[in-house]
Curated annotation (Swiss-Prot):
Chief location category: membrane
UniProt keyword annotation of Transmembrane present: yes
GO terms for cellular component: membrane
Localisation per UniProt entry: Membrane
Keyword list, A-Z: Glycoprotein, Membrane, Transmembrane, Transmembrane helix
Protein name: Uncharacterized protein YBR255C-A
Record: glycosylation sites: N114
Length: 120
């Protein structure tokens, strides 16, 4: 499959870094969700007669919901940070290429700076 062009964000190094960051953020979010679910469950058990009378399955669902919600929200927040940093670095790289080309007397179109790479 020679000649396939893939965007730079398919770079294995970038994908590995993103996977690591999202995994760490998900674990932190899950821990925060667990702390919140435990604290709120204790308060609900103390003050809510409805919560005291629900079955174990409902309580487990309540805890799982908070844990997963914490993990998802934290991972999404980390993804947005990663994208912002990635595009900022990409913009700096493009500006550097444009400046170097201008110093040499070459004037490149912004389209020619696409950060695509070909796979061989």
């Amino acid at each position: 499959m020679g000649g396939n062009v893939l965007p730079i964000h398919y770079d294995p190094k970038t994908v590995k870094q993103l996977t690591k960051e999202i995994t760490v953020a998900s674990c932190i979010g899950a821990a925060q969700g667990a702390l919140f679910s435990i604290a709120s469950a204790l308060l609900l058990r103390r003050f809510s007669s409805v919560y005291r009378n629900v079955r174990t399955q409902v309580r487990v669902f309540y805890h799982c919901s908070w844990i997963s919600m914490g993990a998802v929200f934290r991972a999404d927040k980390q993804l947005l940070k990663f994208q912002t940093n990635y595009y900022r670095e990409e913009q700096k790289r493009r500006e550097k290429i444009m400046d170097e080309a201008a110093e040499r007397g070459l004037f490149l179109e912004d389209e020619s700076l696409n950060s695509s790479r070909s796979t061989t």
